[in-house]
Structures are given as structure tokens and as C-alpha cells.
Regions:
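Short linear capping/connector segments at secondary-structure termini
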Residues: 13-21, 51-57, 177, 243-249
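Rossmann-like NAD(P) dinucleotide-binding subdomain of oxidoreductase/dehydrogenase enzymes
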Residues: 48-192, 319
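Conserved C-terminal structural/oligomerization subdomain of aldehyde/semialdehyde dehydrogenase
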Residues: 146, 183, 237, 264, ...
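Aromatic/hydrophobic pocket-lining residues that form π-stacking "cages" and hydrophobic walls in ligand
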Residues: 36, 86, 112, 161, ...
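ALDH superfamily catalytic-core signature
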Residues: 156-299, 362, 406
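Residue-level signal for inorganic ion chemistry
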Residues: 14, 36, 94, 126, ...
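Short glycine-enriched loop/turn motifs at secondary-structure junctions
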Residues: 123, 176-178, 208-210, 244-245, ...
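Long amphipathic alpha-helix in the N-terminal Rossmann-like dinucleotide-binding domain
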Residues: 1-8, 22-46
Length: 406
């Protein structure tokens, strides 16, 4: 309840630290509250087992115990909801937690930690450490106190953390980089498909691990989809996230803006046609703003199809057959999220089963919700956050073989 009551404060923190529009910040606060509510109910569903023993004079009991202190390492792009996932799951499992936010977003996470304490969480149960990321992460992972690590970050950082955690055989949950395909079949409603693409792609200006980053449109619908997508994207308002009607804020850092500009130039050099954007917007002398950019004449060999854009860049490609697009979409080392637009239930099921990602959104832009397990496969990591599966990663399994005769 306190998260919802303080959603305006939390949204302002995210607007100031990330550049996120206020409406998106409020939505993130609502999603964070949902996650706390879900995990508060999960405490009732940590079921043990009584197993029939093969011996008549013994009994077998299986139960769960808290794993211990958790180190939660969170990124800057969704500082509130990603911290909420880790903190609420740890609390539900009976674990204390030390949160290390990104150096860009300590204020947002500090506000959440204060809300936990204000809600009655005992002192020392939810803690925050902010500062130099490599130093703090190394100290946490090398500590004998830490029994579990939960990381949301890049695949590069995940591999480094995993190597360090291996020394102590610490349990690790990792949600890492993504490169999400957005597939539009020829039976899809193009009006709805473009709305879905806008909502999924431009959340946090594309600085999202589940943001669609390669658009595959079946041949007969490509022209109509691209034209309508360009038309709708033009109408998005860019500006200061603190302004109520803004839909797209800036890139969060100068480094992020520079990387986007370099990738755009690389894509153009490789032969892509810019249909929209491709530059900083006029009238913005300050800030790290960049226009939503839509490319055509892109092939699967382009750099942008291999490197996670993590920004408002949209390469458009075409395909002929179902088997072809699934094969092309799966031809990547990352596997976090994918999006499918189709009016065929049979095609929706086949695509969901065959595409190699941990989460699939069919005819909806929503991927991560409180009641479902969120995470990836391949080099996107392992373990899940959300749903009924997440809490098991914060628990140890123990069984007792009990003799009942003296």
C-alpha cells in the first residue's frame, strides 16, 4: 500500500535519475506493489512433503528453509521494479537482503528501502549499499555471509559474477541481456500489431532488456505495417520526463547516447535505409535525447541484428514462411523475450513452443507480470523471478528420515 501511496515520489525519482516519463514511473510503482502483494501470498504456499517411506518404522519429511543473506544487484533502467522483485522474494522466503543499486539510481532504491522499513520490516533485514559497482560487488560475492546472488544486468557482467560466485559455489539467479524478435504474421490485425509494437518498443525509450529489437513482418503485410508504424511513431512526444504529457525521455547517460549514435551510423554504412529518425531531435540543446529510428533494407548479417541496441532503434525485415522466421529469430545467443502477432491459435501455439526464449508475448506487449516466472535461456541467464517458481531459488531443501521406534 505504501508503494502505491508514494507512487508520485517514486516516479519523480525515476524521472530525475533515469529520465523516465512520470506516467511510466507510476506504472512501474504499481507493478512493484503487485510483486510485493504476490510474494506476500507466496509465503503461504511454501509447501513441504511427507513421503511414504519404504520402511514401516520410518517417516520421510521434506521441507524448505531460508537460504540466508541475499545480495541483490540491480540495474538502472528499472530500478524500482527489479529491486522489488528481489527484495520481496527474499523477504517471503525469510531471508535478509543487501541491495546494490546502479550508481545512476541510488535514490529510487533508497526510497524503496525506506518504504520497507516504514512498513515494519525490522532493521537490518533490508539493506542498501551504493558506490563503486566492481568494488562492492566483489566484496559482497567474496563474503561468507552471502549465500545467494540475484543479478539483473548484461551478459558480460553476468559471466564475471558467475566466475566469482563459483569459488564459494553460491546460488545465483541471473537475468541478463536480450535481443527480442517481434514477429508479425500475415493474418495479424495490423492496427493492433502496430499499437503493440509501439507499447513494447518505446517503453523507457527502448532501454529495456525485453524491448523488441528486430522486427520480422510477413511479406504481404510488411509495407502496411511499416507505414503505419512510422506514422504512429512520429506522433510520440519527446521531452523531459518530468513533463506530464511526455512519452519519450532521453537516453539515460551520455555513454548510452554515444553508443546509439555509433550503432545508427554503422547500420547506415552497412546499407540500411532510414525511414524515420536517425539523429538527435531539433530544439534540444541539453540532454541525451535521440529520435525513434526506423530502418528498412536490413539483413540478418547487420551488426544491429547481433548487438543488443538498448535504445529506440527498429530494424524492419521481411519473411516468407513460418519455419523460416522461427529459424532466423532463434539464430542468436540470447533468449529472453519474443513477441508474436497472429490471429491463428494454432500458429500462436506453434510459435510459442518453437521460439527459443524464456518468455513469449502473443498479441500483447506485456511480458513481465507478478504472477508469472520471468527469465531467459541461452546466454540470457537462468533462474526465474516472479510467479510461484522464484521463491524456490531463495530456499534450501531439507529432508528428515525419522525413525518412529525407540
Amino acid at each position: 500500500d505504501l508503494i502505491r501511496k508514494k507512487q508520485d515520489v517514486l516516479a519523480k525519482w525515476m524521472a530525475l535519475e533515469v529520465g523516465k516519463p512520470l506516467a511510466e514511473g507510476k506504472a512501474e510503482a504499481g507493478g512493484s506493489a503487485d510483486i510485493f502483494e504476490w510474494n506476500s501470498e507466496e509465503t503461504k504456499r511454501i509447501y513441504g512433503q511427507t513421503v511414504e517411506s519404504r520402511f514401516e518404522d520410518t517417516r520421510v519429511h521434506v521441507y524448505y528453509q531460508p537460504i540466508g543473506v541475499v545480495a541483490a544487484l540491480t540495474p538502472w533502467n528499472f530500478p524500482l521494479v527489479l529491486s522489488a522483485r528481489k527484495i520481496s522474494t527474499a523477504l517471503a522466503a525469510g531471508c535478509s537482503v543487501i541491495v546494490k543499486p546502479d550508481v545512476i539510481t541510488p535514490g529510487t532504491v533508497m526510497e524503496l528501502v525506506d518504504i520497507c522499513r516504514e512498513s515494519g520490516v525490522p532493521p537490518g533485514v533490508v539493506n542498501l549499499l551504493s558506490g563503486d559497482p566492481p568494488s562492492i560487488a566483489s566484496q559482497l560475492i567474496s563474503s561468507d555471509i552471502i549465500k545467494k546472488i540475484s543479478l539483473t544486468g548484461s551478459t558480460r557482467v553476468g559471466k564475471l559474477i558467475l566466475k566469482q560466485a563459483a569459488d564459494k559455489v553460491q546460488r545465483v539467479t541471473m537475468e541478463l541481456s536480450g535481443h527480442a524478435p517481434f514477429i508479425v504474421f500475415d493474418d495479424a490485425n495490423i492496427e493492433k500489431a502496430t499499437d503493440m509494437a509501439i507499447a513494447a518498443k518505446f517503453r523507457n525509450n527502448g532501454q529495456v532488456c525485453i524491448s523488441p529489437s528486430k522486427f520480422y513482418i510477413q511479406n504481404s503485410k510488411k509495407k502496411d505495417f511499416v507505414n503505419l508504424f512510422v506514422e504512429k511513431t512520429k506522433k510520440l512526444k519527446i521531452g523531459n520526463g518530468m513533463d506530464a504529457d511526455v512519452q519519450l525521455g532521453p537516453m539515460t547517460t551520455k555513454k548510452r547516447l554515444t553508443e546509439i549514435e555509433e550503432l545508427v551510423e554503422k547500420t547506415k554504412q552497412e546499407g540500411a535505409k532510414v525511414l524515420l529518425g536517425g539523429k538527435r531531435p531539433s530544439g534540444f540543446n541539453k540532454g541525451f535525447y535521440y529520435e525513434p529510428t526506423i530502418f528498412d533494407d536490413v539483413t540478418d548479417e547487420f551488426t544491429i541484428m547481433k548487438q543488443e541496441p538498448f535504445g529506440p532503434l527498429c530494424p524492419m525485415l521481411s519473411f516468407e514462411t513460418f519455419d523460416e522466421v522461427i529459424k532466423r529469430a532463434n539464430n542468436h545467443e540470447l533468449g529472453l523475450a519474443s513477441y508474436i502477432c497472429t490471429n491463428s491459435m494454432e500458429q500462436a501455439h506453434r510459435a510459442s513452443e518453437q521460439i527459443e526464449t524464456g518468455t513469449v508475448a502473443v498479441n500483447t506487449p506485456l511480458v513481465a507480470i507478478a504472477e508469472a516466472p520471468f527469465g531467459g535461456i541461452k546466454q540470457t541467464g537462468y533462474g526465474r523471478e516472479g510467479g510461484s517458481m522464484a521463491i524456490k531459488d531463495y530456499l534450501n531443501v531439507k529432508y528428515t528420515h525419522l525413525g518412529i521406534k525407540g
